[in-house]
């Protein structure tokens, strides 16, 4: 899981407490629980109900604003862009972070090559599900308003920016049956992956990971 890579920068231990916001079924947290991390919680208001796993992991049908305890790490893996009140949410994050705590936010960003190239067919535009598309500047402004600092940004875009956008250009829904039986050749897929890597190196990828601290 690519999301696990972000923890390599955070010195995660068994005792590190992690809150994952907008976690869905909690697959990432489940992997961390199996790896030995003890204090984990997932929250997602769009789940049908609370989830309790056999290994002790809990995923609650809640908003982050309903959480009261402090956390060493708070993560948003492509959930922050679905939140209608990002400023208030970041303020809550600032209040919930423990001393020396960290927040990790993975989101699509602009400007980027994919937006400039595909325009309204850019797969990450995703209206109306994405309330906001942030830039490095807007994220820094939001963070500063609530007393947080962005200390690291990594571009982590993937081939989806091409595959998904090309499907939209052809008027094929992303989740349509024929989009799963790929219309792209192996050569095209390799080219998409290579292009995504190059864009990340040049800070032109269509998504990034923001690391924040108090």
Please place each PLM-identified region on the residue numbering.
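Short N-terminal helix-initiation segments at or just after the protein's N-terminus
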Residues: 3, 20-23, 148-161
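Conserved SAM-binding loop
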Residues: 2-120, 128-145, 207-214
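A C-terminal cap/extension of S-adenosyl-L-methionine-dependent methyltransferases
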Residues: 154-214
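Short glycine/proline- and charge-enriched loop/turn segments
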Residues: 118-127, 167-175
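Bulky hydrophobic/aromatic packing residues
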Residues: 59, 111, 122, 188-189, ...
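A SAM-dependent methyltransferase catalytic signature shared across enzymes that methylate proteins
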Residues: 136-155, 186-188
């Amino acid at each position: 899981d690519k999301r696990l890579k972000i923890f390599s920068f955070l010195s995660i231990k068994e005792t590190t407490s992690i809150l994952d916001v907008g976690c869905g079924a909690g697959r990432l947290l489940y992997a961390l629980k199996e790896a030995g991390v003890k204090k984990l919680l997932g929250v997602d208001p769009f789940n049908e109900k609370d989830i309790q796993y056999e290994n002790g992991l809990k995923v609650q049908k809640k908003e982050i604003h309903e959480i009261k305890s402090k956390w060493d790490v708070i993560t948003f893996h492509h959930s922050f862009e679905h939140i209608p009140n990002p400023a208030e949410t970041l303020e809550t994050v600032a209040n919930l972070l423990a001393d020396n705590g960290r927040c990790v936010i993975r989101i699509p960003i602009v400007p980027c090559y994919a937006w400039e190239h595909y325009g309204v067919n850019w797969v990450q535009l995703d209206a109306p599900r994405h309330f906001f598309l942030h830039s490095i500047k807007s994220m820094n402004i939001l963070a500063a308003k609530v007393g947080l600092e962005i200390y690291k940004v990594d571009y982590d875009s993937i081939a989806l920016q091409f595959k998904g956008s090309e499907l939209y250009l052809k008027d094929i829904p992303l989740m349509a049956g024929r989009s799963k039986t790929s219309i792209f050749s192996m050569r095209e897929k390799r080219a998409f992956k290579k292009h995504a890597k190059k864009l990340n190196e040049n800070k032109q990828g269509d998504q990034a990971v923001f690391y924040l601290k108090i």
